[in-house]
Amino acid sequence: MRLRTPLTELIGIEHPVVQTGMGWVAGARLVSATANAGGLGILASATMTLDELAAAITKVKAVTDKPFGVNIRADAADAGDRVELMIREGVRVASFALAPKQQLIARLKEAGAVVIPSIGAAKHARKVAAWGADAMIVQGGEGGGHTGPVATTLLLPSVLDAVAGTGIPVIAAGGFFDGRGLAAALCYGAAGVAMGTRFLLTSDSTVPDAVKRRYLQAGLDGTVVTTRVDGMPHRVLRTELVEKLESGSRARGFAAALRNAGKFRRMSQMTWRSMIRDGLTMRHGKELTWSQVLMAANTPMLLKAGLVDGNTEAGVLASGQVAGILDDLPSCKELIESIVLDAITHLQTASALVE
């Protein structure tokens, strides 16, 4: 048995389950494993150079012929170049962490790609719907990384109401990890679920085993939403570094951000000019202070230290609240099959209540 939803029909995937484009986590191995398991895997390109993204796409295509996606920073200076790369390589889905410009949406749709931005409010849902988005991901406050204050149980129905009548599939994110959640999301009216932390904690994830163990040790109160990482609300595991950031001075955090800006420039091969240009775009788009723009350089380097280098003391571990309830490391195939079968069981049980 399978679940057929507007999402599975739109993209041509077997199951309405999406693996989100987590920086430093969603590489070729995880994405291809998700795709081969019947879900939608999304490559995280924000922490890749253009050449690295091209190489990652090639790796995915070498081991799967199933649809997959690429997540792009809509405010990046080279967003257009990344879109053109996706089009040349025939990538099925373009995912955006911010609302992309109308021109980018039009270019992708002209090429036959499916455009799926992530949004955090009903007003944003209405905007991207009017601009021609094919679907959207809505993440509630339970989700990891940059997040908002509204729980999925309230944000999801508000977004569904905002786009009612448009036929645009809405994908629920934030707090999902099993079949019960998928069944609940479908009952709300969503077309599927997107998960980050749950896919990070699989055997197909390249995150170091020691870091995975640190996630599995977390309790339900083991995450915190902090603004000390990059100036914006960021849900992360409560680690020693995070506690220091929370209790330390802002001046010290600002100085650390300046050092990390230099490290990120060298790692990404970006010029100071392009970083400043991206900063100007970011500041205008989100109405941030210059301090917050500079602090944003903390994010990629601190996440890399934890998720790639395995240094949980010097790095930051973005995490959804679901980390506190997870206790296993299944393969993507095992995970998706279990979620779908469990969801079908719960939907059948619920339907039996109706007389």
From Swiss-Prot:
It catalyses: (3aS,4S,5R,7aS)-5-hydroxy-7a-methyl-1-oxo-octahydro-1H-indene-4-carboxyl-CoA + NAD(+) = (5R,7aS)-5-hydroxy-7a-methyl-1-oxo-2,3,5,6,7,7a-hexahydro-1H-indene-carboxyl-CoA + NADH + H(+). GO terms for cellular component: plasma membrane. Keywords: Cholesterol metabolism, Flavoprotein, FMN, Lipid metabolism, NAD, Nucleotide-binding, Oxidoreductase, Steroid metabolism, Sterol metabolism. Requires the presence of IpdF. CDD domains: NPD_like. InterPro entries: Aldolase_TIM, NMO. Gene3D superfamilies: Aldolase class I. Pathway: Steroid metabolism; cholesterol degradation. The keyword NAD applies. Its EC number is 1.3.1.-. One of its GO terms (molecular function) is nitronate monooxygenase activity. Disruption phenotype: Deletion mutant does not grow on cholesterol, but grows as the wild-type on glycerol. In the presence of cholesterol, disruption mutant accumulates 5OH-HIC-CoA. One of its GO terms (biological process) is cholesterol catabolic process. FMN binds at residues 21-23, 173-175, 196-197. It is an enzyme of class 1 (oxidoreductase). Belongs to the nitronate monooxygenase family. Involved in the final steps of cholesterol and steroid degradation. Probably catalyzes the introduction of a double bound into the C ring of 5OH-HIC-CoA, leading to the formation of (5R,7aS)-5-hydroxy-7a-methyl-1-oxo-3,5,6,7-tetrahydro-2H-indene-4-carboxyl-CoA. This is (3aS,4S,5R,7aS)-5-hydroxy-7a-methyl-1-oxo-octahydro-1H-indene-4-carboxyl-CoA dehydrogenase. It comes from Mycobacterium tuberculosis (strain ATCC 25618 / H37Rv). The lineage of its organism: Bacteria, Bacillati, Actinomycetota, Actinomycetes, Mycobacteriales. The gene is ipdC.
